[in-house]
Each structure stands twice: as C-alpha cells, then as structure tokens.
C-alpha cells in the first residue's frame, strides 16, 4: 500500500505520536525516558519548534507542538533516529524501534488543539500510572513544569495555555487549568492499559480532523520546498563552520573519513542544526551514516576538545 501523503505546514498545531514496534516497552526505565526527553529538547531547539505539551509512556509518546519553519519531517526524523540508534546500541539489538515513521494530526489553534493538550497531559492518569493528585510529580510529562516556570527551559506550556485555552500563565491560570483537567476526567473515567489507551485513541481520532485541515492552514509551498529550505540552512551553517576552522570542502575531500577535522566539523554542525547523518557524510565524505555516527560518538566520548580541530 502506498504511504499516505504527509501534510506539512508552518501554521497551526501538530499532535504527534508514535508507538514502539510491537508495543515493546522501550521507555520502561527512567533512563530511557530521560534519553528521549533530552533528544526531544535538543530537536526543539535546533528546529525552532514550540513544544506546548509532551508525555512519555512506557511504549509510546505524545507531543503537541507548532513548527514555524514547517520542518516537522526533519525534526521527527532526527528525534526518532537519535533515540533509536542509542537504544539499539545500548541493548545490542537490531531492527525497527518504532512501528512507523510517526503519526501527526494537524489542526488550527482552537478547541480541538486545546483538547489534545488535555489528552496528552492526562495520559499517565488514564493509564493508571498516577492519580490526578500525583500528576504534578510525574516527571515524564510537561504538566510537571506547569507551576514551575523557571524549570521549563524551551518548553512552551505557558504559551500553550494562552494560545489554545485562553488561560493566563499565572498561579490563578494554573489552578484554572487543573480544574479543567479534573473536569475532563470526570466525564471519562475509564481505566485502560497503556496499549489500550493508545489503540483507543487511534481508533477514535480517525477522521476527526478532516474538517480542521482547511485551506487557511496550508502554505503556498510544497513539502519538498520546506525541506529544501531547512537543508539550505544546513549548507550555510556548514560553510560558516568550515570558514571558522580555516579549511575548505575541497581540502577535506582527500582526507580519510575518520579525519579529526572532518569529525570535529560534523559535530559542530550538528550542534547548530538537525542535519541528517546521511547529509553530513555526503558533504564531508565520511563513509556511511552509521560510521559517521560512531566517529562522532567516539570523538565526544574521548573528552577531546572540539574547538580548533
């Protein structure tokens, strides 16, 4: 079956979600959840996303975000590849980590997006992991940061409250949002396993967004053009890094893939943008993407300074 065409936009809100291959508990440990969240916030920074809400369960995740640069595909590729590669390296496993590329529902920043924000935050409660009273202490959703603005970093939960719910990001607003979540729970008190919760959501959301994908959310640019824009930024950053290092692309071509300058340049580029490993290996002649990732990991793990390579 042909893959359904993915809709990309730099407007509106995306609810992004995915589950592990065969429902495996890839996020069972706090360490695995932490690894995913760290990768998520790195992508949020590099891609310029606004992350309104997230939840990481044992076998799936939910994200609610906007993409001002229209680069959802790029960011999700980097996020899932980064986590999957580290997960497989730690486990010594092979094969797929996630059951699909990812799923994404797109809508305007209105009631539907607000309901999705509620759904994301209530996932741990509906799965029976915590009670509503304990939700603020569950570390793997954005709700924990609701009453702690100083700990949010690049999390835009406050902007989400104001944009989607019309609730001020103040103590009074936080109280109002908690009351809203309690009210939502009152209308749906089903207790489901994580797998049942995910499958139930997927079944209920089919077709629910058909009226939300109006022409007002589309941009006069194709998916290919949006991705090309993102890659043009990578080219600019690569040029800047090479200039700062005092080396040209031509000078690097004849050097071996493991050359310290090549590896250092690749790391610096990845620190500033979500460039694909395949893109870097092609530009810097670093062999295969897997080999390039190994070289960068080995270089960073050695404790060597990246500056002045």
For each feature predicted by the language model, list its residue ranges:
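Conserved N-terminal diphosphate/IPP-binding helix and adjacent helical/loop segment
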Residues: 63
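Short Pro-Cys-Gly-centered "Cys-loop" motif that presents a nucleophilic cysteine in a tight turn
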Residues: 1-58, 66-309
């Amino acid at each position: 079956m042909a893959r359904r065409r993915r809709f990309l936009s730099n407007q509106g809100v995306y609810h992004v979600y995915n589950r592990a291959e065969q429902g495996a508990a890839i996020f069972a440990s706090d360490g695995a959840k932490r690894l995913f969240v760290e990768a998520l916030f790195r992508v949020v920074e590099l891609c310029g996303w606004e992350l309104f809400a997230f939840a990481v369960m044992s076998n799936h995740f939910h994200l609610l975000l906007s993409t001002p640069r229209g680069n959802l595909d790029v960011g999700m590729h980097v996020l899932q590849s980064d986590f999957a590669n580290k997960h497989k390296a730690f486990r010594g496993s092979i094969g797929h980590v996630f059951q699909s590329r990812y799923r994404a529902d797109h809508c305007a920043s209105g009631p539907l997006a607000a309901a999705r924000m509620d759904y994301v935050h209530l996932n741990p409660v509906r799965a029976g992991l915590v009670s509503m009273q304990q939700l603020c202490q569950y570390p793997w959703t954005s709700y924990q940061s609701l009453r702690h603005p100083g700990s949010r970093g690049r999390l835009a939960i406050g902007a989400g409250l104001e944009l989607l719910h019309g609730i001020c990001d103040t103590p009074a607003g936080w109280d109002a949002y908690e009351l809203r979540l309690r009210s939502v729970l009152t209308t749906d008190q089903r207790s489901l396993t994580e797998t049942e919760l995910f499958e139930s959501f997927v079944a209920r959301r089919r077709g629910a967004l058909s009226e939300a994908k109006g022409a007002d959310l589309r941009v006069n640019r194709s998916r290919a053009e949006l991705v090309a824009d993102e890659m043009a930024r990578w080219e600019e950053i690569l040029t800047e890094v090479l200039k700062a290092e005092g080396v040209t692309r031509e000078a690097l071509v004849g050097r071996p893939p493991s050359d310290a300058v090549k590896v250092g340049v690749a790391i610096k580029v990845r620190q500033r943008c979500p460039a694909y490993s395949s893109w870097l290996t092609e530009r810097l002649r670093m062999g295969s993407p897997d080999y390039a990732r190994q070289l960068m990991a080995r270089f960073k793990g050695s404790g060597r300074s990246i500056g002045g390579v």
